[in-house]
Amino acid sequence: EMCIRDSTHTDWLRNRLQNCYKKGLPVLVSEFGTCDASGNGGYNSTESTKWLKLLDSLKVGYINWSACGKSETASAFNSGTNLKAIKSGTSQLTASGKFIRDWYRNH
């Protein structure tokens, strides 16, 4: 089980993941975010794309963190969004939320 924060966990952790995979060890990314480990660093679509391409190529499952409306970079929804009344479209999504929505829809 791995937790990934794209701006913090870069090539060194991708290499570790690949080594585990080559050894036949089971791997699941139980949470990943599109920023640094604090959950509130800069949004990093470049590192996110590197991670998701690798995970898809290895057929490793992953779950995005965080589907909330907290005022932080990792949140999928804008601060103050009523999660009980989410509308379709992207108006309530953060940059991270839009990236993840598009990734899941296209992969």
For each predicted feature, which ranges?
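Extracellular glycoside hydrolase catalytic/binding regions
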Residues: 1, 5-61, 65-69, 74-106
